[in-house]
Amino acid sequence: LAMTEDTVARARLQKEINELSIRSSEYVIPNEFNRLINRFGGSGLNAATSYDATIYFNTFSPQYMVQWAEINSERLINPVFRLFQSELETVYEEKNMYGDFIGGQVMDTLMARYFGPHPYAYPIIGSTKNLKNPRLTEMHKFFEDYYVASNMALILSGDFDAQQVMPILEKAFSRIRSGNAPKQEKVMLPPFNGRETMKVKFPIPFIKAMGLGFRGVSA
């Protein structure tokens, strides 16, 4: 991904969509999604955003495969961001919590030093400036651009018969819009000159720590 101000904004939008998609779709009331998952034996409903993927996950009982597929495909097809403003508070809270964690501040500084101008140099949740300027229209556009079938993958693990499950999944998830997500420009990592040393200072007394970073094999 090319790291620009637009890319930072996209990362923020994805985080906000995560929070909203857990709670709403066209045919349910706020928080009803979680109750539906629980009703059909599900638990652990959550979402996560990393530098390279967005993941929605939960556990559920195999006998409710039909209901699970219907519910989870629906939120990828007909989400309604009616809780946009209230759910921003959840994102703000997470941003503040992360900012209070000393290790997180140090890691952000190190990532910015060793990965700039690559996207890995920027916090996933975005900057405070980004979070203070939300636009619902941008969120809708992000969803339309990136939530297409060719940009998704479904992973199931557990005790079930794959031959019986495939028709259920195809019926539910084939309703997701087809299309291709926007092509992203590749950004090369800056050269790593072997041993580099940097010091990070924060106004916290009596705490000293050392971290070691290694350039791994490219994905």
Predicted regions located by residue number:
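M16/insulysin-pitrilysin zinc metalloprotease superfamily fold
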Residues: L1, T59-L88
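Non-catalytic beta-strand/loop surface segments
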Residues: L1-Q63, Q85, K95-N151, R175-A219
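Conserved short hydrophobic interaction patches
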Residues: R75, K171-I176
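Extracytoplasmic/secreted cell-surface and envelope-processing proteins
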Residues: A162-M166
